């Protein structure tokens, strides 16, 4: 894990007894953070924003948690999972403080979104760490995914010129966007996440062959829904994102 290289201590906000630095100095180094509470892990990324320059990543951290395993089988987050997540986020908060992070965005996706005790969980996160976590829906996930790859798409003329299918496979869902000349015209979120499908397969009774048939039928039904909503056959190129996609590649 990397540590701050150019800090003697945590940054502080100006007080009545200290003068604020010039605007140019303030803009030259602005550490910000994003936190992602996913189905199988919680992740932190800290970057430094400099006016007119691309973000410089300072720190990345990830901790495995079982939010999806709990939410997708029992519908609620278990005590052990909540405690493990709190410990991870508490550690992330200390890392953020060491960089002097003031601005951040923390989001939770399908696992927390579907848990019946999500409000209790979010309250505990706020009390324990001081972090305010925002539960986002599928449309916001798609928007953030597109925003993240938009600049990269512009560097590939073939992807911008034609029709491209953008797919992000997460633990709880798969987010699909159909891009025409680099702009999204269709998008949707579907229950095809790796953790969700694995938990569903384990919960079904019967022989291995019977469970495989049920699994395939379930996937086929979801794919039919996707085809009704998104013109898959028109896509000339495909772009897959996410840890599971990288593993398959």
Question: Which positions does each model-derived feature cover?
Answer:
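Primarily the dimerization/phosphotransfer
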Residues: 40
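Nucleotide/phosphate-binding catalytic cleft detector across ATP-hydrolyzing
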Residues: 1-37, 45-169, 177-249
């Amino acid at each position: 894990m990397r540590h701050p290289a150019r800090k003697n201590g945590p940054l502080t906000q100006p007080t009545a007894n200290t003068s604020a630095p010039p605007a140019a100095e303030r803009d030259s180094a602005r550490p910000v953070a994003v936190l992602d509470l996913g189905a199988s892990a919680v992740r932190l990324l800290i970057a430094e924003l400099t006016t007119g320059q691309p973000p410089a990543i300072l720190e990345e951290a990830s901790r495995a948690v079982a939010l999806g395993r709990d939410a997708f089988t029992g519908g609620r987050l278990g005590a052990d999972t909540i405690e493990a997540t709190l410990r991870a986020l508490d550690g992330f908060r200390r890392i953020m403080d060491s960089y002097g992070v003031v601005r951040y965005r923390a989001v939770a996706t399908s696992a927390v979104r579907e848990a019946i005790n999500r409000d209790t969980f979010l309250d505990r996160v706020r009390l324990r760490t001081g972090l305010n976590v925002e539960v986002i829906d599928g449309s916001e996930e798609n928007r953030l995914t597109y925003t993240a790859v938009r600049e990269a798409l512009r560097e590939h003329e073939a992807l911008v010129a034609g029709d491209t299918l953008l797919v992000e496979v997460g633990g709880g869902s798969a987010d699909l966007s159909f891009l025409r000349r680099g702009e999204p015209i269709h998008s949707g979120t579907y229950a095809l996440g790796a953790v969700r499908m694995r938990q569903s397969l384990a919960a079904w009774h019967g022989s291995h062959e019977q469970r495989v048939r049920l699994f395939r039928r379930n996937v086929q039904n979801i794919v039919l829904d996707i085809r009704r909503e998104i013109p898959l056959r028109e896509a000339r190129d495909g772009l897959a994102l996410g840890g599971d996609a990288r593993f398959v590649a």
